[in-house]
Amino acid sequence: MKILVTGAKGFVGRNLCENLKAVRDGKNRTRPALQIEDVFEYDLDTPPAELDHFCAEADFVFNLAGVNRPKNNDEFMQGNFGFASTLLDTLKSHANRCPVMLSSSIQATLIGRYGESDYGKSKLAGEELFFTYGQETCAPVLVYRFPNLFGKWCRPNYNSAVATFCNNTANDLPITVNDRATELELLYIDDLVEEMLDALEGKPHRCDYDGLTPVFHDSGRYCAAPVTHKVTLGEIVDLLERFKAQPSTLVLPEIPAGSFAKKLYSTYLSYLPKEKVIFDLKKNEDARGSFTELLKTESCGQFSVNVSKPGITKGQHWHNTKWEFFIVVSGHGLIQERRVGSGEVLEFEVTGDKPQAIHMLPGYTHNIINLSETENLVTLMWANEQFDPAHPDTFFEKV
């Protein structure tokens, strides 16, 4: 299969092309039904003559080309309708009836605040052009009305509030929010790309529109990605402030699978300047070795790394409710545990050559001994709660 992507250097085009090439090159094996031979990338700097060749060869066309921020409103129609007409005429000249996808906009509904949108009018004209083309040629036509998009590689200070907020937060620039309660419907770029790959496999999600809302059914005139997120500007800004604070607090906010927070965090990180990609951790060091907190979570405890010098014993304490995993990743050590009030000692000899996780049981005093005379013992530790100096739940007692 040969695929033509117009607007290939834009935000959506770049993400789509890289994912198409990952499938083509066997790097993405989640789409075994897709056999991609070539990806034709067409953009403003592509010689126009190449469009003729691409249209002759293409087995599927993603038309992502368009104008978002013209110098004058007349350019909306030229960029969003004019090129679409050229593209379809070129396909016609080669009698190529391959499926064609159009990236339109929710503004094409011309409803509410979009009623007088020149951008929306140009997008609607492009839609009707595609639908007419489909009727005339019997080529499959897939028209997507995108809501607000966000994700990596989106240009800030252009046409995405999320991109601007992420960029400014990451680079310590101010953010202007006129109304924190303003709600946006947002589509994450990876969810959109997955939908476009579904479309390529002949499985688009079809719909019609009830106002601005897609109503999904198999015979719908339009297509839409099924997963979007409705979120307020205030919620976005609050999340970004928590992401920004993570290197200093070590606290990773809740980012459940599929959540907006998870997708926004990934987007935010893509805007970090080089100096923020790396950050220092506080190493608590003494004659015995060191202890460094790595990461804290809001509901799943915290991670730390402990280094014990040769011959050193650490620990010698127990907890009521706190419990831990100890995982030796380098060196040779002995972990001992004894239930408080009992004389029986549980012993586990561990080595970094064979990583094993050892429970530090509640109500058991425990220690960890470096058995080596020459090498440090390095242990990754997880505790089921963040350390609270006011309630440490830690009591000294030798094993």
Locate predicted features.
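Conserved Rossmann-fold NAD(P)-dependent oxidoreductase catalytic core, especially the SDR/UDP-sugar
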Residues: 85-127, 134-137, 141-144
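A short glycine-rich, His/Asp/Glu-containing loop-to-beta-strand
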Residues: 275-316
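Mid/C-terminal beta-alpha module of Rossmann-like enzyme folds, strongest
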Residues: 198, 202-283
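NAD(P)H-binding glycine-rich loop region in Rossmannoid oxidoreductase-like domains
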Residues: 44-86, 90-94, 107-114
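NAD(P)-dependent short-chain dehydrogenase/reductase
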Residues: 131-143, 147-184, 189-202
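N-terminal Rossmann NAD(P)H-binding glycine-rich loop of SDR-like oxidoreductase domains
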Residues: 1-26
